[in-house]
């Protein structure tokens, strides 16, 4: 057998071999490049060396010096290594989809209303988003198959400017654009859901999330003392939620029969959408499907997903507020090198996942929901795609190194870490298929020398899954997976090379010539502030920080204080929980602060886990103001009359359509009044008719923007504190009503 492995050796190298080696050598060398640690290069390449030797069709002038028996052993090792890495994850996927539901199916079988549905807070950061796209995203949230009374959207603008796009959006939500001044945060009720529109100082996505979290924590401070059923959903401003997304998330997080209510975080399935298909958008669509339904499914089966993307992630708020001080820590001036910057800024979603994985007390608390879907806009140009993937690559590789070198994760998720380690070794061969093609074209090697079995097994197993996904999700573009199998290695190689050569630039989208840097006249703190003044805090050359500032000891991995921090308090019936018990366990941790972190006084209301989300001071934030408090009496009256007339017209059209399907022509006046009570929060009796003026809609706003919603007055320090409850007699619901269990009045907040 060994003799058959070595072909007849030629005396001299053919000309094609001379041509081939310089070409493939460049790719092979770049595959071995590592921007952070030569030690990692040696380990990964050394482990994968047998696979390289067994697969690459090297010239016989080289292979003739290899020991025949050693080559045979290495080839068998490569075969079984590839087989294990392909078949085992494939079996994980099959098992996962047999047990769990895949697709846009309704999983909640009993009725949901404002008493039985958990409260959900949606955080949507906005930065220079098209108003039409943003309005579509907001409508997808409030029109979800979920009780509107339990939805609270925080629309947070990353910037304080009051420009035309901002006015178009608030006008669509029912906020007049004729106000003399606009407070930082405005509350409004839109289609039955509560929306808080805020403007914060420009500082990037994470800074916007931080300010929004502080606002949420202040609004729901008293509510969280007695409840643990508040959930936080992060989505992007261009994401379109599926109607069943919220409901299916809540099923896995809280409502599943027999649930222990200990799920910490989940992500869903993100698919791409575009108005015009091209090769780039089709490849992205297939990559989204394969990356989430295959890779994240395997991770979920191994104990936890390793990335909670900011485009679609739901968190238990009580768990997130315990990690907020670590996730939102202001350490921009302490970025000693590009590694720390890529870990905490470019890969902030993976960094948050890393914190949750360490804070969890057991496996399978960070999972993927295979029935929660959303759509996001696909990148249209290759230049934008290259910048996006460069950002993803740097955030991925830095957090991957942190994860695989953290002993705590190896102890808690041994199988997950092993699978991730094996998959990272394959990144060394991202261009393997391309190299093989060049080898056949430019050398004396023949097709029979190629590892056809490896290619067939890899393509075949993955293609079977992609065909199933295409049928199940009705996304038949997934059947073009062989095209992705051929082209993606080349694109991945470009992303890696571009990321390596631009890793020294601290910028969100790519290198810039005017990036702020530290020198003998500028401190790191001044460089960061200069970048913020320029309008982009991410435009800083962090490689100048190391020589211009003292060592501050920023840890590569999370502190040991994070380990097991997400322990749960005793669960009581009806989603109440022992807050005092949870407080007792957290106080001990607060009395022992992190190194180099000043002691912080306890919150007067004992919500200690929500303190210390910033190490830069200035922890005060104002509560949102109701839109009606900003209007005159005449404006409130006009706004009320206009909204009531538009609502009645819309309800009549809806009931006529429903009546046509059921053989009914009109709905009774009594039912109409009940519908009105459900769709809008009624004014307290005796308060009189509020007055207001309906705003004039800009011509660029969609026609749906004419449907205004009336805001409800009240003290916003409590979520819907003084709001009257809607009527429940003959109340229409998106979900068939069943018998409700009794709950305490405090839960009706």
Swiss-Prot record:
Its main location: membrane. The gene is chsG. This is Chitin synthase G. Disruption phenotype: Leads to elevated spore production. It comes from the Eukaryota. Gene3D superfamilies: Spore Coat Polysaccharide Biosynthesis Protein SpsA, Chain A (3.90.550.10). Residues 728-742 have a biased composition (Basic residues). Polymerizes chitin, a structural polymer of the cell wall and septum, by transferring the sugar moiety of UDP-GlcNAc to the non-reducing end of the growing chitin polymer. Plays an important role in septal growth or maintenance. Mediates colony spore formation. It catalyses: [(1->4)-N-acetyl-beta-D-glucosaminyl](n) + UDP-N-acetyl-alpha-D-glucosamine = [(1->4)-N-acetyl-beta-D-glucosaminyl](n+1) + UDP + H(+).
